[in-house]
Amino acid sequence: MNFTGKNVVITGGSTGIGLATAKAFINAGANVWITGRSAGNLEKAAAEINSPNLQTVVADTAQLPEIAVLEKAVTQAGNKVDVLFLNAGIATFTPIEQATEADFDAQFNTNVKGHYFTLQKLIPHLVNGASVIFTSSTVATATNVGTSIYSATKGALNKIAQIAANELADRKIRVNIVSPGPVQTPGLESVIPPEAKAYLAAATALQRLGDADEIAKTVLFLASDDASFINGAEFLVDGGYINYATK
């Protein structure tokens, strides 16, 4: 797919799925902005990608003033945005009995408020016919123990994306959702013990974890003209996790 000259904004683009997607868009010719909370991680990402078409923005999109920093960086470039990939996210897994207000607020601020207001602030900067893609998760549908807050954030994102697809349709802006299953990323490593990875792999029909590059390819497809009649849809990229029945 060719994205030469297209302008792409990716939140949470310094590691994992965001980084893999930034690489894919750069390789397809796009100009890419990535955000992250850590300047160090953004520097590492920039060195790894090593392209003049990449710009990094230190911004925690859970904070509205920092969304304004991203908006300013985009507007100063003088170009409208063709693709907005709302990907930043965090997770902690605890039973409802043990969850804290801090757990709740952190995940909803990053996973829901951040996406909502980043979209809101960047809508005026989207070209007509742009593509907006949300990173959700199979947990929005699944009912795994210990995931109540994280799952709730992803369920909320799905509804926001579906309504946005209707609200922005008059400008031919398509809004879609990519919902990964268990994917090998630094984020996954940070929230589950090593022995749990084998369990997650066994819970998929393909009997393995996904790769961030596989999610990136789906994002590029949804952002491309090949998906021009896809709007308000959720794409499960989960190796059969949701529908797999263990034998």
Summary of predicted features, one role per range:
Residues 7, 14-16:
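Conserved glycine-rich cofactor-binding loop
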Residues 95-96, 100-108, 188, 200:
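Substrate-binding pocket helix/loop in short-chain dehydrogenase/reductase
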Residues 99, 143-151, 163, 246:
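Active-site loop-to-helix junction immediately N-terminal to the catalytic Tyr of the SDR YXXXK motif
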Residues 119, 153, 161:
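Active-site helix of classical SDR
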Residues 124, 166-170, 228:
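Alpha-helical segment proximal to the catalytic Tyr-Lys
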Residues 204-215, 226:
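A conserved structural motif in NAD(P)-dependent oxidoreductases
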Residues 220, 231-247:
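Short C-terminal tail/terminal secondary-structure segment
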